Regions:
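AAA+ P-loop ATPase mechanoenzymes
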Residues: 1-187
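Pre-Walker A (pre-P-loop) alpha-helix and adjacent loop at the N terminus of AAA/AAA+ ATPase modules
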Residues: 178-211
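Short glycine-rich substrate-engagement loop in P-loop NTPases that contacts/grips substrate
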Residues: 193-197, 234-265, 276-282
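Walker A/P-loop
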Residues: 211-241, 254-259
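Conserved catalytic/switch belt of AAA+ P-loop NTPases
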Residues: 259-260, 275-321, 327
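Walker B catalytic acidic pair
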Residues: 270-272
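Conserved AAA+ ATPase "SRH/arginine-finger" region at the nucleotide-binding site
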Residues: 321-333, 340-354
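C-terminal alpha-helical "lid" subdomain
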Residues: 346-405
Length: 405
């Protein structure tokens, strides 16, 4: 393929148009543009090669590996249509053509690029010092077909690269370094978590799944359970979207955006509570009741709360003049009943606390006699305000750091 063809095919990408915004591919396009322009000086070309390689080497030295991963993870109209079960014939033809070109591009070397731009007589030793990136051979069309068949688990676009997201200005933003909590690292409360896990498995299987409320005492592992479940089932196609309380009104729009996505989503609201006149109360109630649009089958709302009834009562709430005050309070407190599944996390009694401690001590390889460990932990818990898994973990971390001896 001649330089002009490489350059034209890059500029002419349709299905994979978004690749031109990729930081590495964009540098390659700039390089071929400069070479195609026929720069009389080698300076601009050397600069473009160096810029391309610097961008590539931030990730890998293998250009073929980088480009193939970018292709497989790209969000395109083809992958969206295929996920919905129908791919237009014209788009299929365009997809096949571009995959054929991109496979060739995966094998492009610097020497080959120079040979297409300059005759052997015209090449100069000034270019010899430039490093040579690696390439790889692969059947990109077959790899892409395989990826399309697994899109319900691996996703596309940012959902292929990340599994935890937050919401900023109505848009999903990937969390690059999510909490790495694993279920195996959470001793105790197995029965409570199993209910949430079973509901999550139903969601992943495309079966009816409940919205879930995890409520109970602070520090009992409610939030950790949700995050660990998200980590555990990410390879199965689960994604977690953390929604703040003041963003609840955005949930209907988020559901609309995610409804056609082949992945499954948990909209996670942590530490949920309201005052009686909170506008967010009405928003969440409408969402849970399904009165704001229909609930998508690939989405469930999981919330944690330290209060069973979610509503923070004040003295004025209890002594107001409203003749319907009792009915109002009843309506407010009934919000918790709108969750299909509620799971209680209670502060552990002494025996349960000690079991959690011993398991955490094993995980962290704490070398301390059991009797001494339990006595010190009990004293630590008293100073910390009571027993809880969080307190147990804090104590073990202090032992690991040498603070507790």
């Amino acid at each position: 393929m001649k330089l002009r063809e490489w350059n034209a095919h890059l500029h002419g990408l349709v299905v994979f148009r978004a690749l031109l915004n990729d930081p590495v591919v964009a540098k390659l396009l700039d390089l071929t543009d400069r070479m195609e322009a026929g720069c009389s000086s080698y300076g601009p070309v050397c600069d473009a090669v160096a810029a391309f390689e610097a961008a590539l080497f931030e990730y890998t030295t293998n250009w073929g590996s980088y480009l193939s991963n970018a292709v497989l993870e790209a969000e395109t109209i083809c992958v969206r249509q295929a996920a919905a079960g129908q791919l237009d014939a014209l788009l299929q033809s365009a997809l096949d053509s571009e995959l054929q070109f991109l496979q060739q591009l995966c094998g492009l070397t610097l020497d080959e690029l120079f040979q297409t731009a300059y005759s052997e007589q015209a090449q100069r030793p000034e270019l010899a010092f430039l490093p040579r990136w690696q390439t790889c051979e692969l059947d990109l069309a077959a790899a892409y077909a395989q990826r399309m068949s697994e899109v319900g688990k691996k996703g596309y676009g940012m959902f292929a690269k990340h599994h935890v997201f937050t919401v900023e200005n109505g848009q999903l933003v990937p969390v690059k370094y999510p909490d790495p909590q694993r279920l195996s690292e959470l001793p105790g409360y197995e029965k409570e978590r199993e209910k949430v896990i079973a509901n999550t498995k139903a969601l992943l299987a495309g079966m009816p799944a409940n919205n879930v409320l995890l409520y109970g005492d602070a520090g009992t592992g409610k939030s950790s359970a949700v995050k660990a479940i998200a980590n555990e089932f990410a390879p199965e196609g689960l994604r977690l979207v953390e929604v703040k309380k003041n963003q609840l009104y955005q949930i209907p729009d988020l559901m609309d955006k995610l409804a056609a996505n082949p992945l499954k989503f948990i909209l996670f609201i942590d530490d949920l509570s309201f005052t009686a006149n909170d506008d967010n109360f009405a928003a969440l109630k409408a969402i849970l009741e399904g009165s704001v649009g229909g609930r998508a089958q690939n989405i469930a709302v999981y919330a944690t709360s330290n209060r069973r009834h979610l509503i923070k009562e004040t003295l004025s709430d209890r002594t107001g003049d409203d003749i319907h005050e009792a009915d109002t309070r009843q309506k407010l407190m009934s919000l918790s009943a709108r969750f299909g599944l509620t799971v209680t996390f209670q502060r552990p009694e002494k025996a349960r606390f000690e079991t959690i401690l011993e398991e955490l001590a094993k995980q962290h390889n704490i070398q301390m006699p059991t009797e001494q460990l339990l006595l010190k932990a009990e004293a630590f818990a008293l100073r910390a305000g009571g027993r809880s898994p969080r307190v147990a973990k804090q104590f073990i971390e202090q032992c690991e750091a040498g603070v507790q001896k």
